[in-house]
């Protein structure tokens, strides 16, 4: 297992957690229903409004001609992809989170994915929900921050390494396929810089806040400001180091991350095969990875950023534009929109799970109080 320190739940901490409410900005019941309404409105626009735009009606109707066997395989790959995501979550957060089993891991991951898809760019909605649940599970704030960083690093290190290796491989001719500069060298350089920054962050001492306190002293507003400023770099350094420990220990979390991305790409491959020939595997991977950068755009529900980016990337690689459109939209239907439904269900299941935790905790406190009173 990783070298992350085990965080022992604190009973006083759990009392504080009872006062914490579910993140309201992202995940109130009303906003969740409105978000689902937005999804259905967007789907209706895509499937009923988009075909009426001049010039793409013929391309759109190709969806009706998709091979059902390949589409069924895409569905299987979708399930396997999110299975990998659940495994990744489970093995990152299990230490110090005694209440987190596979069922709870499923509820948290699917609900957070739904929150990310509906409400926020870059995964902010899912991160807020996950942090709230982990606090209710008995983890300290620092442990939640550290493990969230580990989770994000392990998720995106596979993404960045893939972009670097495949981008360089295509450009140098090691991998077969066209290699336009802007779709190989530029994203590979971006990935390389991101990896270098992460490794440099790992060099920072994890007790940076304590060192700042000792160097400046604990008095005055300047010392307090410096100590707070040192908290985030120290947490990031600890998170990156713990991620490296997971890799060295060959933790199942790594397999979960690889499975998540690999099966996601497999969904896209099956979507291409449902309507024609898939591009060379390296082009398929690079087009997928470049398109996923659209997740960083602050668009409602993430609509348009990934879709447009992925379609544009494949067209830039020379893939037939009609095939690229139907394949990418089919992929998004499976990997993005379809899981939102079980994610919404998992969200309400998660609320019941957290309520059960509170009841169990309250029962334990009453039992302890009665035992002390009878002693």
List the model feature ranges, each with a label.
Residues 1-110, 169, 174-292, 336-375:
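Predominantly cytoplasmic-facing regulatory/coupling regions of multi-pass membrane proteins
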Residues 79-80, 118-122, 157, 258, ...:
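Hydrophobic/aromatic residues within the transmembrane alpha-helices of Major Facilitator Superfamily
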Residues 91, 123-137, 165, 300-316:
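Re-entrant/interfacial helical elements at transmembrane boundaries that shape
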Residues 94, 106-137, 230-237:
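Extended non-transmembrane interhelical loops and adjacent amphipathic helices
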Residues 94-95, 117, 136, 273-274, ...:
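Transmembrane helix-loop junction
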Residues 103-107, 122-127, 136-153, 318-330:
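Membrane-interface alpha-helices at helix entry/exit sites of multi-pass transporters
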Residues 111, 115-119, 143-164, 190-193, ...:
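Membrane-embedded alpha-helical segments of transport systems
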Residues 111-121, 272-274, 286-307:
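Transmembrane alpha-helix interface/packing and boundary motifs in multi-pass membrane proteins
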